[in-house]
Amino acid sequence: MAEPQEKSLDDFFAKRDKKKKKDKGVSGSAAGSRGSARPPDGAPSSSSSMSGAGKGVKKEKSGKSDNPDQLQEKEDDEWKEFEQKEVDYSGLRIQSLQLSNEKEDDENEKKEEQGADWEETGGYGTDKSSGPWNKTSQAQAPISAVTEAPEPVHTGGVYRPPAARASVSTRKPQGPPEIYSDTQFPSLQATAKHTESRREKEMEKTFEMVKHKNRARDEATKNQALRLQLDNQYAVLGEQ
């Protein structure tokens, strides 16, 4: 049942399209017949219309040729030099800034004048005219000349330097070395004796040696030691 319905719809749309095509063909033929007809007396002819079109094209071309000159004149008018008016800044505190700018301009002019020599000498932004090498060296204080005393001149004898002379004057005649002296031939025993002597000295500071002053006391102590206890120590026990 679905297939015959689809066919009927297709036939309906096909017929509709055919009718539209026929209507378009009829309207086109009518317009062509009207165009082929002669225009009225008041209307301009085709030749006059063509000539008018040619004149319009020529005018457009001439207008285009004139436009570039006008554009150049306008551009020239736009690039006018601007002249800055001088203003009095004496009331304001801007003079220092203006002076610094003037100094920078002067330095740039000097660098431009020097040209290639500036780069060859290795300037690269530093002015060689101002530097520590151009500063005037301060006057050095005069160095006082040291006057040395003249040495005594010896007419005879052998020359000796001053150091040798001083050593000779301080020397003393030396005899043979002392073998048993601890100072010339030190040993470990000498150090031990030295420590003992130091101890003895310290003991002497704290104790006093007394000789032959307490003989009576010594004899009394001896007699007490010689006494014998002959009493019966156990007699007390017998009495009880």
UniProtKB/Swiss-Prot annotation:
* Name recorded for this polypeptide: Protein CDV3 homolog A
* Family affiliation: Belongs to the CDV3 family.
- Biased segments, Low complexity type: 27-52
Principal location listed in the UniProt entry: cytoplasm
Look up the domain of life of the source.
Eukaryota
Question: Native species of this protein?
Answer: Xenopus laevis
GO cellular component terms given for this protein? cytoplasm
Q: What keywords are annotated for this sequence in UniProt?
A: Acetylation, Cytoplasm
Question: Which subcellular locations apply to this protein?
Answer: Cytoplasm
Q: Which residues form the signal peptide?
A: none
Keyword Membrane assigned to the entry: answer is no
InterPro entries, per database record: CDV3 (IPR026806)
Instruction: List the residue ranges of the region (Disordered).
Output: 1-204
Bias class Basic and acidic residues marks the residues at: 1-15, 57-73, 193-204
Q: Spell out the Polar residues composition-biased ranges.
A: 127-141, 181-192
